Amino acid sequence: MPAFDYNRVFLIVMDSVGIGEAPDAEKFNDKGADTLGHIAEHMGGISLPNMAKLGLSNIREIKGVEKAEKPLAYYGKMKEASNGKDTMTGHWEIMGLYIDKPFRVFPEGFPDELIHELEQKSGRKVIGNKPASGTAILDELGAEHMETGALIVYTSADSVLQIAAHEEVVPLEELYKICEIARELTLDEKYMVGRVIARPFVGKPGEFKRTPNRHDYALKPFDRTVMNELKDDSFDVIAIGKISDIYDGEGITESLRTKSNMDGMDKLVQTLDKGFTGISFVNLVDFDALFGHRRDPEGYGKALEEFDARLPEVFEKMREDDLLIITADHGNDPVHHGTDHTREYVPLLVYSKKHEKPGALPLADTFADIGATIADNFKTNMPKYGKSFLSLLK
């Protein structure tokens, strides 16, 4: 193996932790969005002592977070180049892609035209058609579905179309076929849904239970990512949390499921104890799913403080030749209008024990700078997009 500047790279994506409106925020109806800033203000100041030491407030002032006189990390912010503000777009861009057609979300449910087509092609009526929790919608509509055979269609805050059906009412094979039809229909640019999910369930009203026969119809990244290059060159690509789903398993050598942010940090810490060469990549989704979309600044702030408190464990276990990168994939300002993501800059903190004089990094024009830096470090094929900042880390 050739010698690398860093043998292991740990990449943490704090899902939706934006750091202020992007220059093109207005185009996305997100003027004034500021996830971190507004949370800190709402709390009368937020306590993030470990990210403070790394240089979080050196990127820009965050209320309650002290500016570091001698930051321990390189710090900066990144602008999203792609034309979207969803999780898949953000993550795919981090790994070297540029997405010009955004995935769509449907906070009001899916357009009548799409539902009508689905009804015609499946031969079944559709009920629901709104954002909902998968268990709550079964309680609400499960009995009606059993009586009528209508499909329960629902979405979430992500770009997803889910179809729930009782296994004794709609046989699995039929449900899977209907989901394939839905997948086909939603590739149309008007709808562009990231993922279609079959959600079979069993049981009686009041006791419905989802079964393990769930099936996902996702999209593979539209081009090769840095993860594909790493895997093909025999490096380890350990995916923690939602990462494997986001890239539809592409370029991944090991996948660890998680139940929460804290579980995600536990799994990341486990990988710090492993001997491997390559990357360990975690997505902490609770910020987004539990607090951003629900517009709960208090809960969001507490979750950030809990995450920050886990960092000393990470620092302690890091080896001299490890690199830690902390960033985000988009914003989700919990005091902004609506319930959708927000178009923002994302923070970039880059830490290693061997850095002698960390400081500011230039503004990144694309999240792909991270992918380019990782590719540069492991001497694999470079992505088409992104500029490596490896040579700036000293």
Swiss-Prot record:
Its main location: cytoplasm. Keywords: Cytoplasm, Isomerase, Manganese, Metal-binding. Mn(2+) 1 binds at residues 15, 329-330. Its cofactor is Mn(2+). Its EC number is 5.4.2.7. The keyword Manganese applies. It is found in: Cytoplasm. It comes from the Bacteria. The keyword Metal-binding applies. CDD domains: PPM. Binds 2 manganese ions. GO terms for molecular function: magnesium ion binding; manganese ion binding; phosphopentomutase activity. Mn(2+) 2 binds at residues 288, 293, 341. It catalyses: 2-deoxy-alpha-D-ribose 1-phosphate = 2-deoxy-D-ribose 5-phosphate; alpha-D-ribose 1-phosphate = D-ribose 5-phosphate. GO terms for biological process: 2-deoxyribose 1-phosphate catabolic process; 5-phosphoribose 1-diphosphate biosynthetic process; metabolic compound salvage; nucleotide metabolic process. Signal peptide: none annotated. GO terms for cellular component: cytosol. Belongs to the phosphopentomutase family. Isomerase that catalyzes the conversion of deoxy-ribose 1-phosphate (dRib-1-P) and ribose 1-phosphate (Rib-1-P) to deoxy-ribose 5-phosphate (dRib-5-P) and ribose 5-phosphate (Rib-5-P), respectively. This is Phosphopentomutase. It comes from Bacillus licheniformis (strain ATCC 14580 / DSM 13 / JCM 2505 / CCUG 7422 / NBRC 12200 / NCIMB 9375 / NCTC 10341 / NRRL NRS-1264 / Gibson 46).
